[in-house]
Amino acid sequence: LYLNFYKDFIMSTESDTVSDTASLFEQMRKKLKGVIPDFEIELKAKYAQEIIQLKKEKNAIILGHNYMEPALYHSIPDYVGDSLFLSSVASKTEADIIVFCGVWFMGETAKILNPTKTVLVPSREAGCSLAEGISRNDLIELKKKFPGVPVVSYVNTYADTKAESDYCCTSGNAGKVLSH
């Protein structure tokens, strides 16, 4: 259901039809003209073409979060969207490797949802200030201070924090979870 709702956000990079860097450059240029200078698009098209080739060779799927760098966003992902949508895609993929171009907790969530797959996050430093707002240790201390109080964590937290929580919610279902 979630995938059907967000079908308008699914983006094909047309990578199956892009056989060379020049074609990819033109495809990217159409989307990025006036946003990124041509010389930068040309350089990034070369990198993107290499990534697309590796993706095919390794049977990988690339998931791109909405906050990705524009040139890569418009060239390499098989799907783009928010973290919840992309996690849903990750849970259903047949690909051997999931490359999650997003922040660290998104890759962790993909691994939780599809534990037999290899999940890669291109940058270990890709953090989220929201997820950094509370650590597992912080939560353990709060649970000691307030024993018996159910803990509800937001989906945008790290896996170790979620593991210490009683419930995990999204912005869309927080009200229902809290009234439970």
Question: What are the language-model segments listed below?
Answer:
Residues 1-10:
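Short, Lys/Arg-enriched N-terminal segments with co-localized hydrophobic residues
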Residues 12-180:
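Active-site loop-to-helix "anion-binding N-cap" substructures in soluble metabolic enzymes
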